[in-house]
């Protein structure tokens, strides 16, 4: 029977201490998964774990500043150990969204964006997906952005890093799909998270441009990620699902 139940499975969610990552960790736990909450801020991470446990779920916090291959491999090893040797769901959510015009864009910032948004998922998958393939089952979900599909002033570097992640999603589906590992991505539009609240009314104006007409809550994105993590999405493979209120459709 096809179900969204994740009981008995362990999920690793990066960037899980706030926003979409936090909402995803909570959503996966509510579907029965044991969740490994990965992030930089221990205080916020412990708070997410406490919220999950208070709701009857199981979770643990794994600290880490994800920015390169070494940090990704280190997290993969610690997460696998914490999971008792088996990670069933990987959500690559950690990301950097620094904006700015092309002229004068700092090279260190450029490298940082591509390091966290592209290199980290690449090496996490390289460490975790082979074991999934060996078991014949697993789900990987990458968190992208609508800026990967449309030109947005000031988002050239950020959008390019996520566009590359979309291609990796398809490449990994081709590489690991025959072994039973599903790899998909979600592409959110405007979402009300702490990192964009500084935009104030501008955020609402951007959200109003979509057919949905409003700015999404993190839980609306998390619900789609949780769906992709489950057997309810058993025939969804290599997809980049737009969860943007229809913004890229018009």
List PLM regions with ranges.
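Substrate-binding pocket helix/loop in short-chain dehydrogenase/reductase
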Residues: 101-114, 206
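Residue(s) in the substrate-gating loop at a strand-loop-helix junction
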Residues: 145
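Alpha-helical segment proximal to the catalytic Tyr-Lys
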Residues: 130, 174-178, 234
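Short, small/polar-rich loop/turn modules that mediate ligand/substrate recognition or access, typified
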Residues: 91, 177, 182, 236-238
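Active-site helix of classical SDR
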Residues: 125, 161, 169
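C-terminal substrate-recognition "lid" of short-chain dehydrogenase/reductases
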Residues: 214-243, 248-249
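Conserved glycine-rich cofactor-binding loop
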Residues: 10, 17-18, 41
